[in-house]
From Swiss-Prot:
<dbReference type="GO" id="GO:0005819">
    <property type="term" value="C:spindle"/>
</dbReference>
<keyword id="KW-0007">Acetylation</keyword>
<dbReference type="InterPro" id="IPR036915">
    <property type="entry name" value="Cyclin-like_sf"/>
</dbReference>
<feature type="compositionally biased region" description="Polar residues">
    <location>
        <begin position="67"/>
        <end position="77"/>
    </location>
</feature>
<dbReference type="GO" id="GO:0010696">
    <property type="term" value="P:positive regulation of mitotic spindle pole body separation"/>
</dbReference>
<dbReference type="GO" id="GO:0000307">
    <property type="term" value="C:cyclin-dependent protein kinase holoenzyme complex"/>
</dbReference>
<feature type="modified residue" description="N-acetylserine">
    <location>
        <position position="2"/>
    </location>
</feature>
<dbReference type="GO" id="GO:0005935">
    <property type="term" value="C:cellular bud neck"/>
</dbReference>
<keyword id="KW-0132">Cell division</keyword>
<dbReference type="GO" id="GO:0016538">
    <property type="term" value="F:cyclin-dependent protein serine/threonine kinase regulator activity"/>
</dbReference>
<dbReference type="GO" id="GO:0051301">
    <property type="term" value="P:cell division"/>
</dbReference>
<dbReference type="InterPro" id="IPR039361">
    <property type="entry name" value="Cyclin"/>
</dbReference>
<dbReference type="InterPro" id="IPR046965">
    <property type="entry name" value="Cyclin_A/B-like"/>
</dbReference>
<keyword id="KW-0195">Cyclin</keyword>
<comment type="similarity">
    <text>Belongs to the cyclin family. Cyclin AB subfamily.</text>
</comment>
<dbReference type="Pfam" id="PF00134">
    <property type="entry name" value="Cyclin_N"/>
</dbReference>
<dbReference type="GO" id="GO:0005737">
    <property type="term" value="C:cytoplasm"/>
</dbReference>
Length: 491
C-alpha cells in the first residue's frame, strides 16, 4: 500500500516541475508579465520561483551583458545559479546560464529572434554581433522588461535588415565618412592627356619645310593598328610598289591596246561590282593583268580570258569567300570554259613567278585618312578619284602611293577643306603639293572628258558611294568653266 502522504508529495512535485519548465521556457524566450492560472496560484514551489525571479530582476538581467570581462560574467552566473539551488529549484542542463556559447559571447554569435509561433520564440541561424548593429540592442535589452516592446524591437530590426540590407551598410559607410571627414580629397579626377609629339622636316640647307605630329602614339594600346611597326611596314610598301609597277611602254607591243584595255577594264568593273568583291581585289586583278600583258603577247580573242583569269586569281588571294570558277565562266557567256580559266591561271602565275605581293593603293589611302581624321566623305570621294587611276590607261606607270595622295588632295578641294598641311604630307609618304600637281591635273582631265567607262561611273552613282561620280564631275566642270586653279583653291 502506498502512503497517501508520499503520493500527495509526488503529485505536487510532478505538477511543480511541469509548471516550472513552462515558466523557464517563457522566461528564456523574453516573455514576462505572464498571467498564471488560478488553479496553480497557491503552489509553494511556483511562489518561491516567482520571488526568486523578482529578486533577480531587481539585481539585473539574467542574460549577462556582453563585456570583455569574462571573469565577472562567470561569477555573476554562478551566484545566480547558487541562489536558485538554495531555493530548491533544479535547473536543466541546457539552461542559459550553463550554455558555453553564452558564457563567452565575445567569441560566439548570437541568434536573432525572427519568428514567434504559439507564444514561443525561435532562435534561428547565427547572426554575428559585428555584422548587425541591431543585434547589440537585443543583447543589451533586459528580457524581463515588457513582452511587447522587446519582441517588436527584435522582430522589426531583423525584418528591416532582411528587406533593406543596404541600410545597415549605409550606416556603416556614413560612420566611416564621418571619421574620414578630415581627410583631403582631390578636387578633380580628370586625367590630362599628353599632346602628340611634333617633328620638323628641314631641307638640305636646314630650312624648315613642314611640321607633323605623331598620330600613331594614340594607337599604342591597339594591337590591330601595330603602331610599333607601322613606319617599317609602309617603308617596305614604298619599296615594293616600285618593283611591282607595270611599264606603259611594254604594253604598246599589243595592237590597239589602249581601246581594248578600256573595254576589258570596264567589263571587269562590272563583274567585280556584281560579285560584291573587295576594292583590293579589283586593284590586284588589273595589276596582274598589266604586268602579264607587258611580258606576253596575247591575241585579241584571248584578252577576255586573261582578264577573267586575273580576277579569279585576285579573288582567291584577297577574298575570304571567293566565287567559284563556275560563276566566272558563266559571266563570259560561253567565251571561256572552266578548263580554259584553270589553264590561264597556271600560265599567268608561272609568267609572274607567283609574285602577287602588290602594295594595294587602298593601304596608302587609309594611311592618309588618319591625318584627315578618317572623314567618311573625303575618303569616299577619294576612292572614286583613286579608281580613275585604275581604269585610265594614262595612269599606268604612276606609283600607287602618289595616286592615293592626289586623290585625297582632290577630294579635300571638292569639300572646301584647308591646305595640304604637314600631317597630310607626312602620312601620304612625303608628297608635297608641287609633286601632286601633275597627277591632279590628269584627274581633272578625266573628269571633264566624255565618259568612256560607263560601268565605272554607274557604280559610283549609287547612294552606297554617296553619288561620288556625279559630285566629282559637276565640281570639275564648274572649276574648269570658271578657270580656277585647283592647286590653290580654298587656301
Amino acid at each position: 500500500m502506498s502512503n497517501p502522504i508520499e503520493n500527495t508529495e509526488n503529485s505536487q512535485n510532478t505538477s511543480s516541475s511541469r509548471f516550472l519548465r513552462n515558466v523557464q521556457r517563457l522566461a528564456l524566450n523574453n516573455v514576462t508579465n505572464t498571467t498564471f492560472q488560478k488553479s496553480n496560484a497557491n503552489n509553494p514551489a511556483l511562489t518561491n520561483f516567482k520571488s526568486t525571479l523578482n529578486s533577480v530582476k531587481k539585481e539585473g538581467s539574467r542574460i549577462p551583458q556582453f563585456t570583455r570581462e569574462s571573469v565577472s560574467r562567470s561569477t555573476a552566473a554562478q551566484e545566480e545559479k547558487r541562489t536558485l539551488k538554495e531555493n530548491g529549484i533544479q535547473l536543466p542542463k541546457n539552461n542559459l546560464l550553463d550554455d558555453k556559447e553564452n558564457q563567452d559571447p565575445s567569441s560566439q554569435q548570437f541568434g536573432a529572434l525572427t519568428s514567434i509561433k504559439e507564444g514561443r520564440a525561435e532562435l534561428p541561424a547565427n547572426i554575428s554581433l559585428q555584422e548587425s548593429s541591431s543585434a547589440k540592442e537585443i543583447i543589451q535589452h533586459d528580457p524581463l522588461k515588457g513582452v511587447g516592446s522587446s519582441t517588436e524591437v527584435v522582430h522589426n530590426s531583423v525584418e528591416n535588415e532582411k528587406l533593406h540590407p543596404a541600410r545597415s551598410q549605409l550606416q556603416v559607410r556614413n560612420t566611416e565618412s564621418e571619421t574620414d571627414s578630415g581627410k583631403k580629397r582631390p578636387i578633380s579626377t580628370i586625367v590630362e592627356q599628353e599632346l602628340p609629339k611634333k617633328f620638323k622636316v628641314c631641307d638640305e640647307n636646314g630650312k624648315e619645310e613642314y611640321e607633323w605630329e605623331d598620330l600613331d602614339a594614340e594607337d599604342v594600346n591597339d594591337p590591330f593598328m601595330v603602331s610599333e611597326y607601322v613606319n617599317d611596314i609602309f617603308e617596305y610598301l614604298h619599296q615594293l610598289e616600285v618593283i611591282t609597277l607595270p611599264k606603259k611602254e611594254d604594253l604598246y607591243q599589243h595592237r590597239n591596246i589602249h581601246q581594248n584595255r578600256d573595254i576589258l577594264v570596264n567589263w571587269l568593273v562590272k563583274i567585280h561590282n556584281k560579285f560584291g568583291l573587295l576594292p583590293e581585289t579589283l586593284y590586284l586583278a588589273i595589276n596582274i593583268m598589266d604586268r602579264f600583258l607587258g611580258k606576253e603577247l596575247v591575241q585579241l580573242d584571248k584578252l577576255q580570258l586573261v582578264g577573267t583569269s586575273c580576277l579569279f586569281i585576285a579573288s582567291k588571294y584577297e577574298e575570304v569567300y571567293s566565287p567559284s570558277i563556275k560563276h566566272f565562266a558563266s559571266e563570259t557567256d560561253g567565251a571561256c570554259t572552266e578548263d580554259e580559266i584553270k589553264e590561264g591561271e597556271k600560265f599567268i602565275l608561272k609568267t609572274l613567278k607567283f609574285n602577287l605581293n602588290y602594295p594595294n593603293p587602298m593601304n596608302f589611302l587609309r594611311r592618309i585618312s588618319k591625318a584627315d581624321d578618317y572623314d567618311i566623305q573625303s575618303r569616299t570621294l577619294a576612292k572614286f578619284l583613286l579608281e580613275i587611276s585604275l581604269v585610265d590607261f594614262r595612269f599606268i606607270g604612276i606609283l600607287p602611293s602618289l595616286c592615293a595622295a592626289a586623290a585625297m588632295f582632290m577630294s579635300r578641294k571638292m569639300l572646301g577643306k584647308g591646305k595640304w598641311d604637314g600631317n597630310l604630307i607626312h602620312y601620304s609618304g612625303g608628297y608635297t603639293k608641287e609633286e601632286l600637281a601633275p597627277v591632279c591635273h590628269m584627274i581633272m582631265d578625266y573628269l571633264v572628258s566624255p565618259i568612256v567607262h560607263d560601268e565605272f561611273h554607274r557604280k559610283y552613282q549609287s547612294r552606297r558611294f554617296m553619288k561620288a561620280s556625279i559630285i566629282s564631275v559637276q565640281w570639275a566642270l564648274k572649276v574648269r568653266k570658271n578657270g580656277y586653279d585647283i592647286m590653290t583653291l580654298h587656301e
